[in-house]
């Protein structure tokens, strides 16, 4: 288990670009698929979708 405050948070731009949200550093390059994109064509579960590099604003200060 990590110590309190050991997670590094990264700012990710939301759909309207005036706002952002925080995600852990582990998820800065990937996003979780929605219900319609959860499975591949051969039936395997898709766990990660590539995130646009434009949407990553950097580490929270």
UniProtKB/Swiss-Prot annotation:
It comes from Archaeoglobus fulgidus (strain ATCC 49558 / DSM 4304 / JCM 9628 / NBRC 100126 / VC-16). It comes from the Archaea. Residues 23-61 are annotated as: Disordered. Residues 44-53 have a biased composition (Basic residues). Pfam families: DUF5350. This is Uncharacterized protein AF_2193.
């Amino acid at each position: 288990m990590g110590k309190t405050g050991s997670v590094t948070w990264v700012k990710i731009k939301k759909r309207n670009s005036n706002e952002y949200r925080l995600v852990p550093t582990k998820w800065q390059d990937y996003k979780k698929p929605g219900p319609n994109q959860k499975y591949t064509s051969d039936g395997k579960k898709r766990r990660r979708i590539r995130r646009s590099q434009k949407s990553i604003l950097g580490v929270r200060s």
